[in-house]
Each structure stands twice: as C-alpha cells, then as structure tokens.
Amino acid sequence: MLKLHVVQAEYGDCFILESKQGKESTTVLIDGGPYQTFEKHLKPTLQKLPLSGKLDLVVLSHIDTDHIIGLLDLFEEIKGQRENEAKELVKVSKLWHNSFNDLLQTNEDPNTLLKNSFLTVNLGSKEDQKKTESSIMTIIMKGFQQARDLTTLAKSLKIPINPEFDKMVLVEDGPKSIKFKDITFRILGPTKKNLDKLRKEWKDWLNEKKLNENLELGLLQILDKSIPNLSSIMLLLEAKNRKILFTGDGSGDDIINILSREGMLDKQGKYHVDILKVPHHGSDRNVSREFFNTVNADNYVISANGRDDNPSVDTLIWIIESDNQTNKSKKIIFTNNTPNIVKVLKEYDQKKYNYECIFSNRNDDFLTLNPS
C-alpha cells in the first residue's frame, strides 16, 4: 500500500508519504508549509492518520518560509510536549535539511557579514541606506534564523540530521540511492555543480558590493530564485513499482539534465512517473513546455492558492498539452482553485484534451492519492 497525502498548505508545500508492506510501515513528511499550516492542517492530519505515532523521515526541501515554518511549529510542539512529559504528537526518526551556512560554505555569521558589507557601500542618503538595508536584512535574517532554529530544535530533540550523508544532502557524481525499508530514495539534487554556482553568486555579491540601484535587486535574485532553484532537495521515491518525483522549487531544466546524464530517459527521451509534484507551485519561471513533454505523469500535484500568480496559465497549458505516453487520462490535483485555473478550464475542455481536474475540499485538511 502506497499513499500520498497532500496537506492543505495554501501557497506552500506539505506532503506525507505513507507506505506499508505487511507489518512494516514507513512514513515520510516532506516540507511543512507556511504560517498556520501546522495548527490548521498538518497537526490535525497527523492526529487523523494511522501513522503509528512516528515519522521515519522529515525532509525540508529548502529554507523558504512556505516550506519551513510548519516544520518549526511541529518541532516546537514536540519539544513542549517532551518538556511537560506529555504524550508526543509523533516521534521523528531523522531530518534531511541543508543549513544556510552549509549551502554557502561559510562559518561566518551571514547576518553580520551582510551588515558589514552595507557599511562599505554608497547607498545615497542615510535615509535611503537605512531603508534599503532594513528591507534586505529583514528578509535575510528571517530566512537564516528559521534555518538555524530548525537545526537547533532538531539537535535539542536528538533528531539526527542528514545521517546518511557527509554533512549535506548532496549529489556529487550521480543520483545517490538510499534504501529505507520498502522505499528507495534517489536523490536528484541539489548537485555539487549547482551549489558551487550558488556559492559563487553569493561571494560575487558580497565582493562587488554593488551600488544602490543594483544592490537590493542582486540579493533578492539570489534569495528568490537562485537559492530555491539551485539548492532544493529533489527526490525520486520508488515503492510498490510506483514512482513519485518531489521537485521542491527546483528547475525543470536541471531535472531533465540529471535524468539525461544518468541515462534514465527512455528511447524517446522521456521519463514517466506516477505522481509529479509540479515545481515551485506551478510557476512558469521554473518549468517549460519541454519539461512536461520530457517528464510526464499520471498525476500532477500543484500546491498553490493564487499567490504570486501560481499556478501560472502557461504551466497549466503545458501540462494539458504535454505528451502522454500511457494514453490514460492525466489527472491534475489542485489544493485550491484560482483565477488562472478557472481561465484555463474554460478554454481547455477536459474531455477533448483527455485530462481530469481534482480539487481538495476546503473543509478537509488533506487529500489522499493512491498511485495505480
């Protein structure tokens, strides 16, 4: 038995994978969603599902707030219960999580480093300098602190971090396969090449100390695009002859390159999975028509609520018009309805284009998929 529970996470991601083989069971939590996800949806889901009171693995794909906050809340809940000698919501066996310092390969405090870099840059008037510094530092400090808090909480709860890896969840020469009970995890990313690129962007930004008009833009480019795209933990899970691809906020081009380089594409240059977690909430900045024609699925899962225009119209059209190797009706699973979805459904008849849309019930905490 293999099930994927898609937890309502609004504009973020939160998934629970459940696998059973005889008396053996495996439960994996991937990402925790943004603010309020834990109290409103993840906690009730963990209480409702028969998970034997355990999470064999918790994975944080990357440190954006719409992925990490729910995990912070979960660990805080467990910590409070343990301190009060109360029954713990779940037992967490291990955590996969790449810290910001490891990603950037620095032992220096990033907040201090940034603060000092601002002191050497001409940002115009003191008022402009304070405004620019404040806006960037708020974003930076929040992200760094949340990543550090998760590491600190995990250590205080004695939860092993990345025990199967040399410090970081990372692909060096090729996808790393880890067998865990009845599930095989193939780590597709992040790659050493992409992390080297991210570190170079970071160091270049610090060294160049660009002037006012480019300073904020350059850093926000790294924060908003480079870090999610280049550092996302991307997993191909195989169990019960089924495949589920978790992409985080990774890049479609990177996924294709990895599959191609490792000889995983078929003779037609395609790769099929039973469930595809569509990258970056369906944003067209991370994917292309080529991606969906190369990587196709029976079920496409999009966790989004319209924020940042996700899922985008182009992404939906690319999925609907993509090649389908199985000739089965493809299913697109949405956690929420949005104006873009309504628009595309009006223009693309489901029967004519051989696809079906499934929406989470707004009164439910999660939707369950049984890949078949």
Give, region by region, the residue ranges found by the protein language model.
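Long, well-ordered mid-to-C-terminal structural blocks that present hydrophobic/aromatic surfaces
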Residues: 235-291, 296
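Conserved beta-strand hairpin/beta-sheet module of binuclear metal-dependent hydrolase folds
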Residues: 1-54, 227-254
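C-terminal regulatory/interaction regions
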Residues: 2, 13, 253, 257-265, ...
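Active-site metal-binding motif and surrounding structural segment of the metallo-beta-lactamase
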Residues: 25-26, 39-94, 265-285, 296-301
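Acidic/histidine-rich helix-loop elements
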Residues: 32-37, 83-84, 206, 285, ...
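Active-site environment of divalent metal-dependent phosphoester hydrolases
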Residues: 11, 36, 63-69, 102-104, ...
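Hydrophobic/aromatic beta-strand patches that form the interior of the parallel beta-sheet core
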Residues: 5-7, 28, 59, 96, ...
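Flexible, acidic/histidine-containing loops and adjacent segments that form or flank the divalent-metal
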Residues: 78-243, 329-337, 343-372
